[in-house]
Regions:
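A short mixed-secondary-structure module that forms the rim of ligand-binding clefts
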Residues: 12-49
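Single conserved hydrophobic/aromatic residue that forms the stacking wall/gate
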Residues: 1-6, 11
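Charged, gly/pro-rich active-site loop segments
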Residues: 51-157
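A general, composition-driven signal for non-globular sequence regions
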Residues: 1-2, 23, 54, 73
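ATP/adenylate-binding site constellation spanning eukaryotic-like Ser/Thr protein kinases
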Residues: 6, 38, 127
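A structure-centric signal for secondary-structure junctions around beta-strands
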Residues: 4-6, 16, 119
Length: 157
């Protein structure tokens, strides 16, 4: 795990088993993934009682065609978090959004939002395996789908 708690991710390229998400290049997770691109992602649906764990290998994209394509599809209102002066997780003496006062509301243009591109990254995660766990009072069920070796297995929960 790379402390990706709360991040929403979308499967962007099903034929190649890729999950991708956006991050700030200054985020701690970037340095962690540079040192070790292997990560795990855990998803849980309380209503369905299903837990899914992905084991992935991550590639960090920054200032390349992949980031440019994703950036161009991002609404300018969503680009706001990449305009902060200091990186995510930087300690502050006061409550702050991290934005310059003139950007601390929604009154900025798409052109002004372009400044955030320098901090924008796309992390593409190649799924190596999927573990599925169904939690049931009558007995749990668990399976592993190994995408690297095309091998599926039932597991004891």
């Amino acid at each position: 795990s790379v402390r990706l708690v709360g991040s929403e991710m979308c499967i962007r390229d099903r034929s190649n088993n890729l999950v991708q998400f956006h991050s700030d290049i200054r985020s701690d997770k970037i340095e962690i993934l540079k040192k070790n691109p292997n990560a795990s992602m855990l998803f849980y649906d309380k209503d369905e009682k299903i837990q899914v764990r992905l084991k992935v290998n991550c590639v960090i994209n920054h200032k390349n065609e992949i980031t440019k394509t994703s950036w161009d599809k991002t609404q300018h209102i969503s680009r706001k978090c990449y305009l902060v002066d200091k990186g995510p997780g930087t300690v502050s003496d006061v409550p702050t959004s991290g934005l310059k006062p003139e950007l601390d509301n929604f009154d900025y243009t798409k052109e002004q939002s372009e400044e955030g591109y320098k901090n924008f990254t796309v992390i593409q995660c190649k799924i190596k395996s999927i573990e599925w766990l169904y939690l049931a009072a009558k007995g749990h069920r668990r399976a592993r789908f190994d995408l690297e070796n095309s091998k599926d297995s039932w597991l004891v929960p």
